[in-house]
Amino acid sequence: MALSMLSSIPNLITHTRLPIIIKSSSCKASPRGIKVKIGNSNCEEIIVRRTANYHPTIWDYDYVQSLRSDYVGETYTRRLDKLKRDVKPMLGKVKKPLDQLELIDVLQRLGIYYHFKDEIKRILNGIYNQYNRHEEWQKDDLYATALEFRLLRQHGYDVPQDVFSRFKDDTGSFKACLCEDMKGMLCLYEASYLCVQGESTMEQARDFAHRHLGKGLEQNIDQNLAIEVKHALELPLHWRMPRLEARWFIDVYEKRQDMNPILLEFAKLDFNMVQATHQEDLRHMSSWWSSTRLGEKLNFARDRLMENFLWTVGVIFEPQYGYCRRMSTKVNTLITIIDDVYDVYGTMDELELFTDVVDRWDINAMDPLPEYMKLCFLALYNSTNEMAYDALKEHGLHIVSYLRKAWSDLCKSYLLEAKWYYSRYTPSLQEYISNSWISISGPVILVHAYFLVANPITKEALQSLERYHNIIRWSSMILRLSDDLGTSLDELKRGDVPKSIQCYMYETGASEEDARKHTSYLIGETWKKLNEDGAVESPFPETFIGIAMNLARMAQCMYQHGDGHGIEYGETEDRVLSLLVEPIPSLSSE
């Protein structure tokens, strides 16, 4: 089938100019080419390369190095500790289960839950142990039932969908009277995104809540509730980047009638102090990036240090994980450069050489590489070995084999896509996906992340890591499909392989609109798998599972309004400013 498809290609990509190699007997230089001397002959080979015309970074070195926060020092540390001591007793004083759940929900959405993980776990354990008693506090209360369901599932407790059966009528449909409870409907909608495969009740709940929440917005409902409903319908809470959600929710919470001023002050101060930590990480990485000179030497590629750092903040923002953010930023930045080598600049012969060198992981094998690839490989080799050296010091483990395998697999997947491009081959959707969940770089990111946060490192986890456990696969799949929704048209214009949308159109004859709907459907189905594998007993620590989930969330954040990684303006610029540059205005009581 693959061979038969080589002869045909959709009109969508036939206009793309292919990179070509011209052997010039007259030895004239092409203004679009690079002249390379061929042996001792008088002729030169002119390699005409593609260009993606990426815009230079808007975040220059001097600007990044100038970022400073006022929220550092002993005064703020003492104030934060005092607020933390004030908040902790709240978790012990609330006794009613619904009050406990509401407090936990607020702490999570404000982004300060990580200070109280043990207390939250103790409360949820108590609630779960009483779960099957069907106490009066939740009976016939859609809001309470949905909130309990969402929080327990989010924290890995096995809660059945049947808990919502009592809200159905004799026909099996959700009761019409529920539509009057907009707060409960919103909570039901958010809870439905914690579903796993085969849960028809949760699918039914999502459709029911979505439909009636949309109608509710047309009515005169509470303004603050309407803001939360619009926000949820745009993207559900379970799919949102936690740090960005915290920044949004702090503003929303400040306007609520039930706002607790101690919680609000704590959330604002913690956000600003953590932002100061992120700025320190960012300045450190800016110095590293400048020292590599890759942005200068490989000017065909995207210079996206800030965006790559933003990814790491989205994946793991807590202040104690600075080393993870810094090393992950190196990984992300190298991925971006190498991706552009394969997608934009390299010839087929060069790409095959580079893939072989990465697979062999031998600096003595890189002599045949062109100079730009030597720089690229050495940066990759040195950064990876630096991380492996740190792991050897800290854990006594030799992890190079795991890291190099991940990079080798990535480059091989890039090479396959390059072969598809040069042969003008459009794969089936399944064939595309079976390769592209690796080429999106999720496995590389997550394999490195495991070694950056896991302690201890277990044999079972290493085995699961090597064969790419499902939690890695599903997270990477969501990353791939979200990327395709946001970038496919731009990438086709600059001469990339067809993405999932075009593969589905070519295979089925569907319209672009229908293909996009199908891709969105696949994202939803993959989230169900990720929910399931994130909740079952796992060889991985909770922190790593959170990273895998957050990588999927970050993908939907970055590609929600287009190519948020490659295009720096608009939403991405606003997010960088709100998360990494601008502190939240202080309360007058600070």
Swiss-Prot record:
GO MF annotation, one: magnesium ion binding
Binding residues annotated for Mg(2+) 3, in chain numbering: D483, T487, E491
Residues engaged in binding Mg(2+) 1: D339, D343
Catalytic activity as recorded in UniProt: (2E)-geranyl diphosphate + H2O = (S)-alpha-terpineol + diphosphate
Annotated Mg(2+) 2 binding sites: D339, D343
EC number: 4.2.3.111
Cofactor descriptive note: Binds 3 Mg(2+) ions per subunit.
Pathway: Secondary metabolite biosynthesis; terpenoid biosynthesis
One example of a Gene Ontology biological process annotation: diterpenoid biosynthetic process
Keyword annotations from UniProtKB, A to Z: Lyase, Magnesium, Metal-binding
InterPro entries: Isoprenoid_synthase_dom_sf (IPR008949), Terpene_cyclase-like_1_C (IPR034741), Terpene_cyclase_plant_C1 (IPR044814), Terpene_synth_N (IPR001906), Terpene_synth_N_sf (IPR036965), Terpene_synthase-like (IPR050148), Terpene_synthase_metal-bd (IPR005630), Terpenoid_cyclase/PrenylTrfase (IPR008930)
Motif position, DDXXD motif: 339-343
Enzyme class: lyase
Residues in coiled coil: none
Cofactor: Mg(2+)
Pfam families: Terpene_synth (PF01397), Terpene_synth_C (PF03936)
Record remark on domains: The Asp-Asp-Xaa-Xaa-Asp/Glu (DDXXD/E) motif is important for the catalytic activity, presumably through binding to Mg(2+).
Family the entry assigns: Belongs to the terpene synthase family.
Function: Mediates the conversion of geranyl diphosphate into alpha-terpineol, a monoterpenol. Monoterpenols contribute to the final grape and wine aroma and flavor. Also forms some 1,8-cineole and traces of other monoterpenoids.
PANTHER family in alphabetical order: OS04G0344100 PROTEIN-RELATED, TERPENE SYNTHASE 10
UniProt protein name: (-)-alpha-terpineol synthase
Organism ancestry: Eukaryota, Viridiplantae, Streptophyta, Embryophyta, Tracheophyta
